[in-house]
């Protein structure tokens, strides 16, 4: 298969498929849109706007859209309604096929592990729709970003660049963003593997304008308080925690539970 050719032409082909799809829309599509509306509506709008801005990051969009002003959002939903439908259709088809694959595996005794990174990209619908949950300044630019300090393998450390969570804000609403995230992941996968688990105990914060990770500082994370809050709402989840890197005594003491396992 010529994957490069497919990558370059996939959306043109999928847009042709969209015309046929909406000539006879299955009832399951509307049910999917209603069930997944809490994330699907924002995601589809976000992708439609990125397409309209030639792939530019949301932080570079015009101010009314960047700051999600109500009038601008309402106008965008109307202007890009057709493109929004396109992205919703893609998600419906993906989830339909994914569920078929997962069911096929489960029926044969195979469980699927899903890798979930602790951080999300700055140019993501998560940050665009929830800016108060991240360390951003008044212009919605990252104040501090994620990474790892210098070590024997890298004199400059690792500058990942992901915006950091406002754990204080997340604590105030009972970690609802994380609860929603893990709830969705638990439907996609049989087991969730959380990458960079030690970041929940303490995390490395690098000034947002820096070009290396040399000037970062360590800060305390929410610890197991986050997972206790999630468990109260979702019950026990089957989680694998990464044990790669230096694990603090606090992390080693608090992390084990009957359904937790470690996997590097």
Regions found by a protein language model. Give the residues of each.
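Aromatic-lined carbohydrate-binding surfaces of glycoside hydrolases
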Residues: 116-134, 186, 198-200, 219
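Short, solvent-exposed loop/turn segments at secondary-structure junctions
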Residues: 51-53, 66, 117-121, 198-201, ...
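Conserved small/polar residues in nucleotide/adenosyl-binding loops
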Residues: 253-260
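Extended, charge-enriched "interface" segments that sit outside catalytic cores
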Residues: 1-87
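Active-site neighborhood of glycoside hydrolase catalytic domains
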Residues: 101-103, 179-193, 197-248
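Conserved active-site carboxylates
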Residues: 170-175
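Conserved, well-ordered alpha-helix/loop/beta-strand core segments that scaffold catalytic motifs
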Residues: 87, 92-119
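Aromatic- and acidic-residue-enriched carbohydrate-binding clefts of CAZyme catalytic domains
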Residues: 1, 53-85, 128-168, 203-225
């Amino acid at each position: 298969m010529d994957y490069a050719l497919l990558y370059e032409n996939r959306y043109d082909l999928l847009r042709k498929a969209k015309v046929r799809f909406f000539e006879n829309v299955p009832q399951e599509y509307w049910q999917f849109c209603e069930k997944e509306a809490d994330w699907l509506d924002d995601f589809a709008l976000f992708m439609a706007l990125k397409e309209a801005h030639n792939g530019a990051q949301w932080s570079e969009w015009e101010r009314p859209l960047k700051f999600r002003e109500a009038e601008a959002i309402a106008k965008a939903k109307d202007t890009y309604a057709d493109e929004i439908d396109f992205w919703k259709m893609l998600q419906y088809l993906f989830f339909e096929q994914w569920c078929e694959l997962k069911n096929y595996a489960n029926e044969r005794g195979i469980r699927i592990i899903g890798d979930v990174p602790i951080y999300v990209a700055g140019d993501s619908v998560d940050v665009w729709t929830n800016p108060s949950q991240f360390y951003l300044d008044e212009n919605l630019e990252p104040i501090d970003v994620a990474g790892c300090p210098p070590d024997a393998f890298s004199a400059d450390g690792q500058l990942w660049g992901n915006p950091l969570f406002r754990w204080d804000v997340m604590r105030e609403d009972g970690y609802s963003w994380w609860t929603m995230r893990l709830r969705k992941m638990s439907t996609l996968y049989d087991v969730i593997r959380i990458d960079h688990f030690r970041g929940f105990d303490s995390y490395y914060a690098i000034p947002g304008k820096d070009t290396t990770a040399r000037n970062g500082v360590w800060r305390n994370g929410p610890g197991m308080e986050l997972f206790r809050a999630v468990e109260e709402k979702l019950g026990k989840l089957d989680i694998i925690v990464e044990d790669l890197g230096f694990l603090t005594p606090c992390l080693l003491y608090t992390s084990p539970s009957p359904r937790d396992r470690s996997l590097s």
